[in-house]
């Protein structure tokens, strides 16, 4: 079942330095089960939001455990902007009823 994974971080400044550091370390994939990845500022909500769509929660959790968590576990000192290293205020999954991806218009419905 397709799921969305969302993280939101309060906007303290408009720096993406730590996000860019993680993205560079992880690379561009391909990652098993990833359908789409987005990241950007939602000024109205006051957050920097990461939103991924995965084929399943298991795919997402495997990716997080293998690629993201080892970097986060190193702590703020490992990041280029340690003063801007914060925990997300929102971090979780939700089941998707329907999703459509890019050029091939690949639809996923529950």
Which positions does each model-derived feature cover?
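Short S/T/G/P-rich N-terminal loop/turn motif that feeds into the first structured element of a domain
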Residues: 1-73, 77-110
């Amino acid at each position: 079942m397709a799921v969305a994974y969302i993280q939101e971080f309060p906007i303290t400044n408009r720096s993406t330095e730590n996000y860019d550091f993680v993205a560079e370390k992880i690379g561009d994939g391909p990652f098993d089960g990833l359908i789409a990845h987005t990241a950007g500022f939602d000024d109205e909500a006051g957050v920097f939001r990461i939103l991924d769509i995965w084929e399943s929660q298991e795919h997402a959790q495997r990716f997080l455990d293998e690629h993201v968590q080892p970097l986060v576990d190193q702590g703020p000192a490992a990041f280029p902007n340690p003063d801007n290293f914060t925990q997300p205020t929102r971090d979780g999954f939700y089941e998707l009823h329907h999703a459509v991806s890019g050029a091939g218009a690949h639809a996923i419905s529950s």
